[in-house]
Design a protein with these regions (language model features):
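Short, contiguous acidic and Ser/Thr-rich linear segments
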Residues: 193-197
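A composition/biophysics-driven feature that prefers long, compositionally simple stretches
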Residues: 1-185
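Active-site pocket-lining segments that scaffold enzyme catalytic pockets across diverse folds
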Residues: 179-189, 199-201, 207
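Short, structural beta-strand-to-alpha-helix junction motif
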Residues: 136-138, 198-205, 209, 214
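Short alpha-helical functional segments enriched in proximate histidine and acidic residues
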Residues: 43, 192, 209-213
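Flexible, glycine/charged-enriched surface loops at secondary-structure junctions
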Residues: 216-218
């Protein structure tokens, strides 16, 4: 079933809105993401933090399922003890909601830094914030401090990396399936190699074989 939820803006140029359209399709079951978020929330509790503002592709994908392509715009995932909200640009329309576990807010380009206003709407001001110091630029950190006015902030990137290193049964199953797909591509490349063949034709043989195997498996 497809449902569309597009909040009617209170003004002609809203700072953000929710565009929840279509059926959700995620790489893993909801229980997998719930377990990952439980681990992140434990990290926050142990560090005395109220919320995590994640900005990297790997952490946003790990905790929500959504893998963004920035198109020059910032993306985020805000996690508190009760909420998990992806923050995305309007260029993606309803895709981030369809591809994420949790809520999604779309920010607009009508006013500079609406991205941070959307994050603020989830965290609130004056909270203790965890962020990724190995991904967030100094300029972005300055904007975070300006808009969120955190009581304190701490780098949680090392803790999230340690969590990601511990693979679940579902992750191991997907890794094994991916390796099997790569085997199919490798054999196709081996069979395609012969004197005089172009490199691009060899590469295409491997790609085509893997695409067919992916379609068959997933």
């Amino acid at each position: 079933m497809t449902t569309t939820t597009l909040e009617k803006p209170a003004q002609s140029r809203p700072k953000s809105y929710r565009f929840h359209q279509g059926d959700r399709v995620l790489p893993f079951a909801p229980a997998e993401y719930d377990a990952r978020l439980a681990g992140l929330r434990a990290i926050l509790r142990d560090a005395g933090l109220d919320a995590a503002v994640l900005t990297s592709m790997h952490n946003i994908a790990y905790y929500s399922g959504f893998l963004y392509c920035s198109f020059g715009r910032p993306y985020g995932l805000v996690v508190t003890q009760t909420e998990s909200v992806t923050i995305s640009a309007g260029i993606d329309a309803g895709q981030p909601w369809r591809r994420c576990h949790g809520d999604n807010i779309t920010y607009t380009d009508w006013e500079r830094n609406n991205y941070w206003r959307a994050i603020l709407s989830v965290t609130g001001a004056g909270k203790a914030i965890g962020y990724e110091a190995d991904h967030m630029t100094l300029a972005s950190k300055g904007l975070m401090d300006s808009f969120l006015k955190p009581a304190s902030s701490a780098d949680i990137a090392p803790a999230t990396m340690r969590q990601r290193m511990m693979k679940s049964a579902a992750e191991i199953e997907l890794i094994r399936a991916g390796a099997a797909v790569a085997d199919v591509g490798g054999y196709a490349i081996h069979d395609a190699i012969r004197p005089g063949i172009r490199e691009i034709d060899v590469a295409m043989a491997g790609r085509d074989a893997m695409e067919l195997e992916i379609a068959a498996r997933f």
